[in-house]
Amino acid sequence: MPKTKLASSVELSFEEPELFVHMYDFAVEITDEFCQIAFPGAFHPAFLLVKLYHILLSVISMGSIIYFFLNYSNLLAFHFNIKILFFFQFCSCFLQSATLAISQTHHLVLALIANGPCDVILAPALFALFNLPLIFSMLCMEFSQVLMVIERTLASCLFVCYEKTTKTIGFVLTSFAVIVPGLTCLYMYYDDKFNYPQMSAMATSPSSKLRINYIFITINVLNVLTLMHSIGLYRHNKQKINMVKGRDHFILSSRFQMNENVSSSKLLWRLSCAQLIIFLLYGCAMYSLRIFLPGERSAVWQAVTEFCYTPPLYCAIMPLICIVCAQNSLKQRNSKVQSLITLRSVGQEGWDNYQGMLQKQWE
């Protein structure tokens, strides 16, 4: 609730919106009555708790990403082309988390020190400064996932010569991972002046709402296709490596790459599954709120809307999935090394093992 004011401060609070209007050219007239109707949740405890939740989640996400880079990034022995896309998605998640943490901290402090309902309105430039990185980083997370699946498809189909190729494919795909989200943001906001009063960086400008809906529908379709393709890619690589498992004369580099294709495609379908669930949950939540909570936006409606902003969940889950995959990869590697160490090399048993290896080599 807004703080209680004396008569003199009440008079001042009615002047503040007037000063704000003269300072910024908003699309609508800013009055206390408008702010109380448009932003009923500005001082609601549930709304403030959601902001605190996003701050904590973002801090945890950034900490998890840093922890992964320091302790587990070297355990994923991937080709440069997939690794650069993989790290680009981590950077996108870090940008999403950092922007969300800063913006929500600003909104929380602003709500706590505000004297009136119009004090929580963001300046147009500040809203754009917070909103654009959130949208851009979210699109980068999505398109980098699609491009990683494309890269693994090329690696699986061209596994004989892919190791000999240069890093050009990785740089080209990473450039697309930046350019496509940038052009998408340009399409979404090319005529948006960011002059509609907003109290949250996650709000949608009325002039861009329809185009944003189209983009999110496209993202959900891409998530479904990416998940299906990544699962098929994993099964294909698994079958391929099973076919050559007993062939010791198979080229070592090709066998290593096939093992890499299996581990990377397995990680990709797990990430794609998490991304699909989280982004689909976000879209379903938004449409459900519009259906089941129609009419004027109450304080609870605004709190639930912010709570349903689920992309930060992916930023928190992605490092955990990668850490688990890296640990499993390390265990499998140690298990294979241990099995070779325990193989007898002396006596009759050692001679039998040696003959068996020679026989497999010449088959």
Curated annotation (Swiss-Prot):
* UniProt GO BP: sensory perception of chemical stimulus
Similarity comment: family membership? Belongs to the nematode receptor-like protein srb family.
Do you know which InterPro entries this protein is assigned to? 7TM_GPCR_serpentine_rcpt_Srab, 7TM_GPCR_serpentine_rcpt_Srb
Primary gene name: srb-17
Q: How does it sit in the membrane?
A: Multi-pass membrane protein
Signal sequence extent: none
Q: Does the keyword Membrane apply?
A: yes
What is the scientific name of the source organism? Answer: Caenorhabditis elegans
Q: Which UniProt keywords apply?
A: Membrane, Transmembrane, Transmembrane helix
Q: Could you name the Gene Ontology cellular component terms for this entry?
A: membrane
Q: What is this protein called?
A: Serpentine receptor class beta-17
Q: Which terms does the record give in the GO molecular function aspect?
A: transmembrane signaling receptor activity
What does the UniProt entry say about where the protein is found? Membrane
Q: Where does the protein principally reside?
A: membrane
- Where does the sequence pass through the membrane? 46-66, 75-95, 120-140, 169-189, 214-234, 273-293, 304-324
